[in-house]
Amino acid sequence: MDLSAVKSTGLSGQMHGATVLDSADQGLRPCILWNDTCANAKPAQLYGSIVFPRLTGPKLLWIKHDKPNLFDRIFRTFLPKDYLRLRLTEEPASEMSGTAGMSWLDTGPKDCRNKIFAVTGQDMSYMLHWVGGCEQSGAVPASFREQKIG
């Protein structure tokens, strides 16, 4: 398949998964999907508000409390589709709805919920590019478009 003919692509996908990466953007474990029940109600209590345990934030708290050696190696966390965007564009970005669905974005002022980041230990400075669902969020680099697949 000749990728040079590709003009655009769209990402839509499964939300509430936790794709955890190290500082070299290598996956540290298989993605924890939305239907995984590893996180229980206890992490939600730490937030000070009701948070559905299957969202991404509580999953990170589960890793922090039950797998501390793994948690210490996490540099950043993406939703599965945002991980694909990172691989396609080499740019970290997320739709506001996706980040809000992680329980990390307050959609009113479009700001991170610092209390939640304090609990999970995550630093969202790498994820300052939030876009609307219909906005362009990046460009596929020429090096990717020049690849031949198949």
List PLM regions with ranges.
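Active-site phosphate-binding/coordination module
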Residues: 2-60
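Gly/Ser/Thr-rich active-site cleft segment
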Residues: 11, 47-150
